[in-house]
C-alpha cells in the first residue's frame, strides 16, 4: 500500500517514464513491481546482487550495484540518457536520498518514502540550488488512504500486480521480533509474512 501510493499518486508514474528506485528492501521492491505495472522503465539501485536480481524478476529493466560504481546517480543518468523522470528513496539514509535526487533529469519528481534513521535524525542536506535550476519536485509519501484501496486491489484482481511475488518467506509469530530487528539492520529481502500465530 505504501509503495502503491508512492508510485501511482505521489510519483504520478506514467507509461514509458524512467523510474529509479534506491534501496531494494520490501518497500523498494514493491515500488519496482508497481512502477513496472504502471508501464515505467524501472531501474533498481542497491548494494546487494540478490536484491538487484529480485528487482529484475519484478520488472526492473536495469540495475545498478552502488557498491561497484563510483557514482550511482551518474550511472542512472547514463542509463536514462540524462536522468530519470521519477526517483524514489525507499531507504531513508543520506546517501540514498542524495543519489535518488541526483539521478533525476530536469523537471523530475523525487518521492521520499524511507524515513530517516537515528543517524540522520530527520535531516538530510539536499542540493537546493539543483532543485531550483532543474525544477525538481520533492514529494513525501506515507501509506495509502483507505478510499484508494480499490485502485490497487483492481490491479491485483486483473493480474497486473501479484503481491505473492514479494513474499520472501513465511514465519511464525515467535520469529517476528527477530525479523523486525533484521529489517532494522537491512538484513532481509522482500517481505516476510507471519502465517503461524500459534
Would you name each region that the model predicts?
Residues 18, 41, 83-85, 109:
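Structural signature of beta-strand start/N-cap positions in the alpha/beta core
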Residues 70-87:
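A short acidic, Gly/Pro-enriched loop at the edge of an enzyme's catalytic core
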Amino acid at each position: 500500500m505504501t509503495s502503491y501510493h508512492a508510485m501511482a499518486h505521489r510519483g504520478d508514474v506514467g507509461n514509458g517514464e524512467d523510474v529509479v528506485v534506491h534501496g531494494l528492501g520490501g518497500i523498494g521492491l514493491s515500488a519496482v513491481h508497481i512502477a513496472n505495472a504502471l508501464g515505467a522503465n524501472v531501474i533498481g539501485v542497491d548494494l546487494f546482487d540478490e536484491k538487484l536480481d529480485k528487482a529484475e524478476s519484478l520488472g526492473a529493466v536495469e540495475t545498478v550495484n552502488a557498491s561497484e560504481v563510483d557514482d550511482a546517480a551518474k550511472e542512472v543518468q547514463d542509463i536514462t540518457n540524462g536522468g530519470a523522470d521519477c526517483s524514489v528513496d525507499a531507504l531513508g539514509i543520506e546517501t540514498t536520498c542524495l543519489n535518488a535526487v541526483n539521478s533525476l533529469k530536469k523537471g523530475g519528481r523525487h518521492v521520499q518514502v524511507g524515513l530517516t534513521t537515528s543517524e540522520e535524525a530527520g535531516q538530510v542536506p539536499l542540493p537546493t540550488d539543483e532543485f531550483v535550476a532543474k525544477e525538481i519536485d520533492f514529494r513525501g509519501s506515507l501509506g495509502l488512504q483507505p478510499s484508494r484501496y480499490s485502485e490497487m486491489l483492481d490491479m491485483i484482481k486483473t493480474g497486473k500486480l501479484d503481491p505473492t511475488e514479494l513474499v520472501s518467506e513465511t514465519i511464525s509469530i515467535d520469529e517476528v521480533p527477530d525479523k523486525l530487528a533484521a529489517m532494522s539492520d537491512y538484513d532481509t529481502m522482500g517481505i516476510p509474512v507471519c502465517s503461524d500465530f500459534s
